[in-house]
């Protein structure tokens, strides 16, 4: 018993030493792989624990003959076997994966029967460095590119986005001089994975992907252009929104004609887009109508909006078709109200408020449009703001706490608070206006929206002369170094 106890302690110390070496290896320290193999580690473990192959086979739930062949080098270790051996040695999952890559793939043979399962297992354990190392080695032989890409697709569909992105990046890097659909799909996936709350980064991500859209399958191009247009819309890049929307509408009309004309009907095996084809035509008009609103061309905006209010021409059928047809009709009603409000037609305000009451999920956008119209046309909308005071406070508190979904949602909410600040400052309700404006600056800093940070600064400077010294000090703190968590908490109550 005493000998077994001492041996056990020695093995624990040895395992800790191995882990220490492995950690330092990742940091640029000692190289475990240069002096060790999985088999040598296993043999040393058996020696120090005084276990026979039969005893360890029972502990690891492996057949003793199989284990003997592995130790004697007569057969390579399969992934499942390696995991069992690792557990039986009391080591953490995936401990030997880097050695496995060296021993059996880089120094052995690149057998996809080992590579594929190893990539998936590394993804399960979030071993991204191992994935990159393995993928780079595999891509030395371009014949593996389709298999590697398919693995990335499997991970993407399973929600393992970081692991998928690591593989997409390597496939794209290796095939960067190829004019292939696979390269374009890699960039498409990287685009969707990389979108975040950082607006500057989103612009870079969109610009990197856009040149690859035309290399995608014609059907994939529709969804890609839709997502690009939505990204540019969140970035207030209206020229790019219009460009992407126009391309999407043109391509969708071509595909729609191919589908509905019997003499040119697509085959049943043709790839289908994520939505019915008419959706992309109508959504193109919706986006272009929004662009016209932003540019102040309200007559043309109404033309686009009336065009998707009547979709009687649609010949596609099914529940999904009816779902989107009804939604576009509802959206057209609201968007026509918005255009008329922006043009100064206050008579539709009551009708638009009634629409918002029936569609509470549109509240943020609804209030944003009402405030933009009020600020542009110097309208008094106090009654409407009083009606939604509780909801506005909730939106404000969520922004201060950072409780939001994606960049587009936070962008809209931050814009709403900016318009509120503008509204109250113009009305000379300075305490409320400055409080909201400071919150606005914080949130535009969070999403790195330089355009609206500049607009917020411009608005503050316009009213600086009526700001208290305390407010000016808080303002300078935000601009010079950003607010600390404690300082941000000072701006938590609406109208304080």
Where are these regions (language model features)?
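Helix-turn-helix repeat elements of alpha-solenoid scaffolds
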Residues: 120-131, 156-168, 194-208, 238-266, ...
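Short alpha-helical DNA-recognition segment
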Residues: 50-69
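C-terminal non-catalytic interaction modules
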Residues: 25-51, 387-394, 417-496
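Alpha-helical scaffold segments of alpha-solenoid architecture
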Residues: 281-407, 411-417
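"A position-specific structural signal for the A-helix of alpha-solenoid helical repeats
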Residues: 117, 146, 150-154, 182-189, ...
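Solenoid-like repeat scaffolds
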Residues: 62, 102-105, 123, 135-142, ...
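Residue at a conserved register position within TPR or TPR-like alpha-solenoid repeats
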Residues: 122, 155, 194, 228, ...
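DNA major-groove recognition helix of helix-turn-helix/homeodomain DNA-binding modules
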Residues: 80-95
């Amino acid at each position: 018993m005493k000998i077994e106890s001492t041996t056990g302690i020695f093995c624990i110390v040895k395992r800790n030493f191995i882990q220490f070496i492995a950690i330092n290896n990742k940091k640029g320290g000692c190289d475990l792989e240069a002096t060790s193999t999985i088999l040598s580690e296993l043999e040393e473990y058996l020696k120090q624990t005084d276990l026979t192959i039969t005893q360890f086979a029972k502990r690891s739930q492996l057949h003793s003959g199989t284990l003997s062949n592995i130790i004697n080098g007569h057969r390579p270790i399969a992934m499942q076997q390696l995991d069992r051996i690792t557990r039986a040695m009391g080591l953490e999952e995936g401990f030997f994966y880097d050695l496995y890559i060296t021993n059996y793939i880089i120094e052995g043979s690149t057998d996809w029967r080992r590579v594929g399962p190893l990539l998936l297992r590394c993804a399960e354990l979030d071993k991204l460095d191992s994935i990159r190392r393995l993928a780079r080695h595999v891509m030395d032989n371009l014949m593996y590119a389709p298999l590697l890409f398919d693995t990335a697709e499997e991970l993407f569909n399973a929600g393992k986005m970081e692991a998928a992105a690591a593989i997409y990046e390597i496939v794209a890097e290796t095939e960067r001089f190829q004019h292939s659909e696979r390269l374009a799909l890699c960039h498409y996936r990287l685009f969707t994975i990389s979108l975040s709350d950082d607006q500057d980064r989103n612009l870079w991500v969109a610009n990197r992907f856009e040149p690859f859209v035309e290399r995608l399958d014609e059907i994939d191009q529709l969804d890609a252009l839709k997502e690009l247009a939505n990204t540019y819309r969140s970035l207030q890049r209206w020229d790019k929104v219009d460009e992407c929307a126009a391309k999407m509408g043109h391509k969708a009309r071509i595909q729609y004609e191919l589908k509905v004309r019997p003499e040119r009907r697509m085959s049943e095996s043709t790839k289908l887009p994520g939505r019915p084809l008419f959706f992309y035509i109508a959504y193109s008009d919706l986006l272009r109508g929004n662009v016209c609103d932003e540019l102040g061309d309200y007559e043309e905006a109404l033309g686009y909006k009336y065009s998707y209010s009547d979709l009687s021409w649609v010949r596609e059928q099914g529940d999904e078709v009816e779902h989107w047809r009804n939604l576009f009709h509802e959206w057209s009603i609201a968007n026509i109200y918005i255009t008329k409000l922006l043009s100064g037609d206050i008579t539709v305000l009551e009708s638009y408020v009634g629409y918002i009451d029936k569609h509470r999920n549109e509240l943020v956008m609804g209030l944003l449009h009402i405030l933009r119209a009020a600020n542009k046309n110097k309208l008094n909308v106090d009654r409407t703001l009083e009606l939604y005071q509780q909801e506005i406070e909730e939106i404000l508190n969520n922004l201060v706490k950072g409780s939001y979904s994606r960049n587009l949602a936070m962008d809209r909410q931050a814009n709403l608070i900016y318009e509120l600040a503008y509204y109250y400052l113009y009305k000379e309700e300075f305490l409320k206006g400055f409080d909201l404006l400071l919150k606005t600056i914080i949130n535009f800093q969070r999403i790195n929206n330089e355009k609206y940070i500049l607009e917020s600064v411009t608005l503050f400077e316009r009213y600086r002369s009526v700001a208290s010294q305390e407010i000016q000090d808080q303002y300078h703190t935000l601009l010079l170094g950003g607010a600390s968590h404690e300082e941000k908490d000072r701006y938590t109550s609406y109208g304080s």
